[in-house]
């Protein structure tokens, strides 16, 4: 006698390989939507941040300690788009990892390294803005290009060293050998991190973020006081030098506001992922795959948001984009073009 009920067909990532992961693909319509959304975010992260780097490095008027930090931050976000988002897009939509175990480790290493690099960049930018707002007279001597270069070096060397040491020595899953063995399959890229290392990761994210929030709270209070002072004195201004100082003060306040929005966007984007992996490590890795992917892509999309924030708040960036896209940037004298409306 034959049964009228057939067993559901199990799809595998690699049909002809023993120990292959199970594939749980989306419907064709959902796949198109997801690929479109993720491709847009990836391309924006790559080309948007490429525009930021080109603008700062090409136009001499933008050669300042703060802008060099912004360009370096854009480089970290650019690398997220190139080395992380494009491959994560395939993993998310296809529910399989087709790029090999070695590249899975490299992918995870880059993911963590560039995240912490962004945190440190933003933290140093906060310190820079705090100095320029609280002590503008000595800012030029305190936060020089050399100091900015040291901050940039630290923002790259520490995260790359930490991430490489964790993932390439295997200490991330010490004590979780049974769980790793149970979850291990061909076509998967799920990095397991022990509770101790997850807690360290959380603190590495939380402490600099807390410092940034405290600094920007002070910055905005001071900027508000300066705004009141400017409104009071602007009507009494007679000399062109005083008028120039007021314009510069307004520009610095706007820069502080823009970078504050950047920090807020970073915290909102990365907090769900950071909290999720912290809870997951102490609850037995029970987070559903779709929740984990939502948290991941919320964090990834932060790399695409910064160029949009700059375009929205910085007139000089919009002007630089026009010059780059029009080809005027190729002219011999383009690097000396004035980008500020003064």
From Swiss-Prot:
GO CC annotation, single: plasma membrane
Pfam families recorded: 7tm_1
Membrane topology, Extracellular segments: 1-31, 89-111, 168-195, 280
Keyword Coiled coil: no
Transmembrane segments: 32-52, 68-88, 112-132, 147-167, 196-216, 259-279, 281-301
Keyword Glycoprotein: yes
Family designation: Belongs to the G-protein coupled receptor 1 family.
Summary of the function given for this chain in its UniProt record: Olfactory receptor specific for trace amines. Trace amine compounds are enriched in animal body fluids and act on trace amine-associated receptors (TAARs) to elicit both intraspecific and interspecific innate behaviors. Ligand-binding causes a conformation change that triggers signaling via G alpha proteins, possibly G(i)/G(o) G alpha proteins.
Protein name (record): Trace amine-associated receptor 8
Organism: Homo sapiens
Lineage, broadest ranks: Eukaryota, Metazoa, Chordata, Craniata, Vertebrata
